[in-house]
Amino acid sequence: MSSKGRGYREVEVSGYTILVGRGDAENDRLTFGVAEPRDFWLHVAGPAGSHVVVRNPEGVDELPRDVLERAAEIAAWHSKARGSRGKVEVHVCRVADVRKPRGFAPGQVLLKRWDAVRVYAKPSEETNGDSGG
């Protein structure tokens, strides 16, 4: 799908829409303006990177494993951890568990609770031909 003019990329995986922020201000808009509380949110643990949102219109409690892993791979790819040779830790939680305290810079957030997955960074075009730009 085309995402020109928006502050995020869009990728489809097994019927789920994955949205990938393009920068700090766009990450904030994606997480706090576009995403719904029941959507899933991912970000590489530690280094700077894109906010990744997996839409959850059905309100499932857990993402299918293939969707979770693919979204985590994309989050790792769109981060400073991209060049890592090993697996990268990615935090995953509900958007409802992401908050932005007053005074935090664009793109910076705190998580109330999260799980972590470890994946290799892989570009989104491996899934559907998205150019990532």
Describe the function of each predicted region.
Residues 1-133:
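Duplex nucleic acid-engaging cores and interfaces of nucleic-acid transaction enzymes
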